[in-house]
Each structure stands twice: as structure tokens, then as C-alpha cells.
Amino acid sequence: MTHQTHAYHMVNPSPWPLTGALSALLMTSGLAMWFHFNSTILLMIGLTTNTLTMYQWWRDVIRESTFQGHHTPTVQKGLRYGMILFIISEVLFFTGFFWAFYHSSLAPTPELGGCWPPTGIHPLNPLEVPLLNTSVLLASGVSITWAHHSLMEGNRYPMLQALFITIALGVYFTLLQASEYYEAPFTISDGVYGSTFFVATGFHGLHVIIGSTFLIVCFFRQLKFHFTSNHHFGFEAAAWYWHFVDVVWLFLYVSIYWWGS
């Protein structure tokens, strides 16, 4: 920062975008190998390289922001715009799944029996595990807001407490979703109902796992005093992402579990 006369961060060459792209290729190819040939070797290599990339990329960003002071207010403003655009792209991603669901359910074809849910499909009761999942995610939305306000007010321990509760609720949601999948009376191959249900809720579940990972990183950073009341964009981005995951679940619950059943 001492050798430049502007507030922007000139990023050093980094291998992580390349290794991230390679891990994405390995994971998608590995999924195809797993589905068609029951081999998980390529998938495991992809997951390993993805985990290593995430760890090292996060480490570099933390070093640049917390220890080298590259994240000036101008840089943080750019990062905020980037996060907003990323969340908008995620909204459009899920819009595709809702479009597929409503396209199939509002005008069911004769092949589906002319009704929704299709003939032979027994949907899950929206007042059982799905309602509990909704309560869990809404509670986590409250606790992440509590953590954010505690951080802005400089209350370190209440922030850690609230963040830990949020992470615990996120993990609990994932376990509930896994048990629901295990006990579901239909599969992803049971026509358009199974496909839209498992792809939409499955991708949401993946986003919950990503969000939980993001929050775990923030928890350990807070333990090491990385955040201050006016310099905590890493946590702020995680909180925005978590609220997005909350809102998507509400739409999923109302559309697929409640109305769709």
C-alpha cells in the first residue's frame, strides 16, 4: 500500500481460479462417472482439490484484508457490489427450478394422469419435517442478525454465541433434510415430480452446506480477532448469503411442499 497512490487492490497472480475450475470439472465429471459407472474416484479427487482450493484461497484473502490492509473502503464497496451481483445470479439460478416446477404442475400432461402430484406419487406432509426445517432456518435468520448487531456494537462473546447457534441450526437443518431424503417415498427418477423436488431442494441443501462452511470460517476468524465493528465484510457477506438461503427455503416450502402437495 505504501508504493501506490490509489485506494484499489492490485491483486497478485493467483493459481486458485485455475485450480477451482479444474476441481469443478473433476467434480462434474466425477458425478457422471458415479451415476453411470458407480465409480467415485474422480469425484473424490474433485472434492479434495475443491477443499484445498477453498482453504488456500480463503487464506490468501484473509491475509490480504486483515494483515496487509488491502481492503480499503473503496475495495470493500466493490466487494459489496460483487456479492450483490452474485446473489442476484443465484436468484436467477433458482428461478429456473421454480419455472420447471410450475410449468409441470399448473398444466399437468395426460402422461402424469392430468393431476398434480402425478398419479402414484405420495408427497411428503408439509406439516411434519418440512415445517420443522422452516422453523430451524427462520430461527437461524434471527441468530445471524443477533450476531451481526453484536459485532457492530463491539460485543465479542454474544457475537460468537449467536454465530455458533446459527452454525448449529444450519447443521441440524442439513441432518433433517438428509433424513427426509432417506425416508422419502419417491426418488429423483420418479418422473417430473421427483426430478423437480430433489433438484430444487437438493441445490438449496448444497447452498446451506456452503453457507454453513462460510459461517464456520467467520467463527474461527472472530476467535482470532479478525473482525472489528467497522471492518467485517467477510462476515457481512456470509450473513447476506444466509438470509438469501432463508428466503429461498420459504419459497420452496410454500411452492413445493405446501401448494405442490
UniProtKB/Swiss-Prot annotation:
Domain of life: Eukaryota
GO BP of this protein: mitochondrial electron transport, cytochrome c to oxygen; respiratory chain complex IV assembly
One cellular-component annotation, GO: mitochondrial inner membrane
Catalytic function, reaction form: 4 Fe(II)-[cytochrome c] + O2 + 8 H(+)(in) = 4 Fe(III)-[cytochrome c] + 2 H2O + 4 H(+)(out)
Subcellular location as annotated: Mitochondrion inner membrane
Principal EC category: translocase
This protein's record includes keyword Transit peptide: no
MF terms in GO: cytochrome-c oxidase activity
Pfam families: COX3
Mitochondrial matrix side: 1-15, 67-72, 153-155, 224-232
SUPFAM superfamilies hit by this protein: Cytochrome c oxidase subunit III-like (SSF81452)
Biological role: Component of the cytochrome c oxidase, the last enzyme in the mitochondrial electron transport chain which drives oxidative phosphorylation. The respiratory chain contains 3 multisubunit complexes succinate dehydrogenase (complex II, CII), ubiquinol-cytochrome c oxidoreductase (cytochrome b-c1 complex, complex III, CIII) and cytochrome c oxidase (complex IV, CIV), that cooperate to transfer electrons derived from NADH and succinate to molecular oxygen, creating an electrochemical gradient over the inner membrane that drives transmembrane transport and the ATP synthase.
Identification of the protein by name: Cytochrome c oxidase subunit 3
Organism: Raphicerus campestris
